[in-house]
Amino acid sequence: MGEKPGTRVFKKSSPNCKLTVYLGKRDFVDHLDKVDPVDGVVLVDPDYLKDRKVFVTLTCAFRYGREDLDVLGLSFRKDLFIATYQAFPPMPNPPRPPTRLQDRLLKKLGQHAHPFFFTIPQNLPCSVTLQPGPEDTGKACGVDFEIRAFCAKSIEEKSHKRNSVRLIIRKVQFAPETPGPQPSAETTRHFLMSDRRSLHLEASLDKELYYHGEPLNVNVHVTNNSAKTVKKIRVSVRQYADICLFSTAQYKCPVAQLEQDDQVSPSSTFCKVYTITPLLSDNREKRGLALDGQLKHEDTNLASSTIVKEGANKEVLGILVSYRVKVKLVVSRGGDVSVELPFVLMHPKPHDHITLPRPQSAPRETDVPVDTNLIEFDTNYATDDDIVFEDFARLRLKGMKDDDCDDQFC
């Protein structure tokens, strides 16, 4: 018989191994009408805890300047949301009962494990990182969500790295089930001294929604009734990042470009389908490019398009990402003619996003002894449960330097 699949649970311990945090996932989905709740468990060494309390915080922050520029008490960082949860001693009236995963973890880890729970507001931005330049140091700019667990006598007490756990989670969106209409655009250019004759450009995409890594098919149709000659046709994909903080500024960055020496003579027509694929691997040196995660990690890609709920307050949205295909005709002695086609670039909703149901089995009548060596979790009953523990750190690209505890995703 093969091994039955287990429920994956991510864990990370403090440097002194006295505190361990467990989460069922690292990415939390924004469904527009609701956001996945953050439910986890923190395990504490009781001998180390003594008379202190256990706090867990969730912070959404927007860093809009390099960390090495934080001088004279000025920080290029704005906290968009902060929530605190006292995991131990438990509050008299907890906000909600433990979830199913928390119940299973509490039974497995024993009496020194304590649940925590956060609700992410719907108006908070999704996680976006702006790609740093080759010479940039410190934390990258962008929006991130951090969970921090620590022991202290009060929430105001300063915590130390050695006895605290920091985890960067991501708030993500997946592609909608019903995509929008097929993008298309057209324009007509009249030239001076051309006897009212015109150059007509029409372009369209085969669909509106594309997944990361999927090629885009751009259909270009040119009707040249003018006396001008189209010398070249350029097709490019541009990423637009609207930075919404104190004021709104827009940055654009080409992520894929294609240039063909396709000429369209006067009084002729032309039709062709161009294929172009925007990939992060072709843009790893571009400073300020919006990404879904850290550049050093394997699951990183170009930032997904941001889907904004109708009526949302854009002032607290952080970074809004969108994409457009630009088709440009290079015309001899007459200026260029171009159109833009907006499209959506996202990940499909994974099939394993919903946790598989636990196999039906009769409940055990006898109590299972809990091992005292909880920090290492060398348990004797692993074969009786379907929980699989995995380190929280994400897989790195080969050759990337390890930043140890300062790494945002470790």
Swiss-Prot record:
Keywords: Cell membrane, Coated pit, Cytoplasm, Cytoplasmic vesicle, Hydroxylation, Membrane, Nucleus, Phosphoprotein, Protein transport, Signal transduction inhibitor, Transport, Ubl conjugation. The modification Phosphotyrosine is found at Y48. The keyword Membrane applies. GO terms for biological process: adult walking behavior; cell chemotaxis; G protein-coupled receptor internalization; modulation of chemical synaptic transmission; negative regulation of canonical NF-kappaB signal transduction; negative regulation of interleukin-1 beta production; negative regulation of interleukin-12 production; negative regulation of interleukin-6 production. The modification Phosphoserine is found at S361. PROSITE patterns: ARRESTINS. Homooligomer; the self-association is mediated by InsP6-binding. Heterooligomer with ARRB1; the association is mediated by InsP6-binding. Interacts with ADRB2 and CHRM2. Interacts with PDE4A. Interacts with PDE4D. Interacts with MAPK10, MAPK1 and MAPK3. Interacts with DRD2. Interacts with FSHR. Interacts with CLTC. Interacts with HTR2C. Interacts with CCR5. Interacts with CXCR4. Interacts with SRC. Interacts with DUSP16; the interaction is interrupted by stimulation of AGTR1 and activation of MAPK10. Interacts with CHUK; the interaction is enhanced stimulation of ADRB2. Interacts with RELA. One of its GO terms (cellular component) is cytoplasm. It comes from the Eukaryota. Belongs to the arrestin family. The modification Phosphothreonine is found at T383. Predominantly localized in neuronal tissues and in the spleen. Phosphorylated at Thr-383 in the cytoplasm; probably dephosphorylated at the plasma membrane. The phosphorylation does not regulate internalization and recycling of ADRB2, interaction with clathrin or AP2B1. The ubiquitination status appears to regulate the formation and trafficking of beta-arrestin-GPCR complexes and signaling. Ubiquitination appears to occur GPCR-specific. Ubiquitinated by MDM2; the ubiquitination is required for rapid internalization of ADRB2. Deubiquitinated by USP33; the deubiquitination leads to a dissociation of the beta-arrestin-GPCR complex. Stimulation of a class A GPCR, such as ADRB2, induces transient ubiquitination and subsequently promotes association with USP33. Stimulation of a class B GPCR promotes a sustained ubiquitination. It is found in: Cytoplasm; Nucleus; Cell membrane; Membrane, Clathrin-coated pit. The keyword Protein transport applies. Its main location: cytoplasm. Residues 364-410 are annotated as: Interaction with AP2B1. The modification Hydroxyproline is found at P176, P181. Pfam families: Arrestin_C (PF02752), Arrestin_N (PF00339). This is Beta-arrestin-2. Disruption phenotype: Loss of beta-2 adrenergic receptor/ADRB2 ubiquitination. Reduction of dopamine-dependent behaviors, loss of Akt1 regulation by dopamine in the striatum and disruption of the dopamine-dependent interaction of Akt1 with its negative regulator, protein phosphatase 2A. Increased serum LDL-cholesterol levels upon high fat diet. Exacerbates insulin resistance. Elevated cytotoxicity of natural killer cells and lowered susceptibility to mouse cytomegalovirus infection. It comes from Mus musculus. One of its GO terms (molecular function) is protein kinase B binding.
